[in-house]
Design a protein with these regions (language model features):
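Alpha-helical scaffold domains
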Residues: 1-174
Length: 174
């Protein structure tokens, strides 16, 4: 897999073609580390989009670079790279031992920011819930935050995940 494969216009067909090649090589970590930090946001975005095509089992091979993915989500200025990196993070294991409070704060901030894109807000809520599940006091704080959202300012995707959590209908993927 080369950088050239990820340049330019990139649709579902291209994402699946690159994913199929990646699947054959099986080197998901090398692929992610080679391209997710690319200076061309299109390359980084296309690489991360390709990774979202992977099965949960395949993505689990990225567990050793969880912190790199978190750093990318926190620091990138590109909303597509942020959303796609958060999508990958959401599918990895977050435990009490690898929980990062800076990422939890980031998720809280982006979950309630009405100026943020709905896809990022929804993922931020899911990830915050996942991280708060280890600590009843943090979970209570998240629930209070979700209850106090002025929900009329949010898009349906955000309303949906918020309501599912508040009604106890959202289940964390293990």
């Amino acid at each position: 897999m080369t950088r050239k494969d990820l340049l330019g216009s990139y649709g579902e067909r291209e994402a699946l073609a690159v994913y199929n090649a990646l699947q054959l090589s099986g080197n998901f970590i090398c692929f992610a580390q080679s391209f997710m930090h690319d200076e061309d946001y299109q390359v980084a975005r296309n690489a991360l989009w390709t990774l979202t095509k992977a099965t949960d089992e395949e993505l689990s091979s990225l567990q050793p670079i969880l912190n790199e993915l978190i750093d990318l989500a926190i620091t990138t200025d590109n909303s597509s790279v942020r959303r796609l990196s958060m999508n990958v993070i959401e599918r990895l294991k977050i435990t009490e031992d690898n929980l990062r409070t800076d990422f939890l704060d980031f998720c809280f901030d982006h979950a309630i920011d009405p100026a943020e894109y709905p896809g990022i807000q929804s993922l931020a809520i899911k990830l915050a819930y996942k991280m708060c599940s280890f600590y009843p006091e943090l979970k209570a704080e998240l629930i209070l935050t979700l209850e106090n959202m002025q929900i009329e300012y949010y898009k349906p995707a955000v309303k949906s995940i918020r309501n599912r959590i508040l009604k106890g209908k959202y289940r964390i993927k293990v």
